[in-house]
């Protein structure tokens, strides 16, 4: 089988499932790989092993010439999507993120403590240790409960992505966030939404994929959204009402002076997003967040927290390098 094995042949097979050569070279192979090895069958066999491991592929299907490359079989998966008429699920994104989730599970020592079903109970717990409920305090709470959290966006170009994913393992759930919006407040809502799925027992095993987190007619999604709102805002859902603001500056000043001054335990980004959703002024809300957080780094906050929780000694050199790359640390 190895006599005619070339990297060009593997690249050709992988491109058919959406994994182009540049992506595979950057994310599947270790940095020490030299293109002089591309036509040496024994070396290519070793390279195929790295590709399969990093990209969650079935190695046998990658090596068998006439067989289509397959991803490793995922656990039972529940997809949550905004458009129920769209049956194009983000399978490629799920496969890549699931490998990331698996590495997180292998690299941390946590044991899950079931969550209270009442969001306000969790909110009170967080506020007993932190001044407000925001992305950082939510991360601290998740890890204290044995819930590992990571952010992943190392996908091939034009890949159908997802907002959030929960993957269960024997001792803990792993949450992966992947929203293109990296504002801390957006990611905090997405994380609170996934906590809602866990607390309300929408998933007890396997995988749940939130393709897009919106206000829609799916019962479980509505419940998770309500849970997230109560967790972030307490009793202040829609507290800004239907006031009109001409621009981001006046909006942010009003919220600071007339709301946050009276509710210091609420993150300003959370109430701004809440206003945008209730009044269909989402563009104004997002523009205001950009003023308040001109260089959004919610993804880095998540992965820096994760990097400090990982036992890096558990990984071989190539996996260590891959994790550094996808974590951005």
Would you name each region that the model predicts?
Residues 1-191, 196-329:
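Active-site hotspot residues in diverse enzymes, especially metal/ion-binding acidic/histidine motifs
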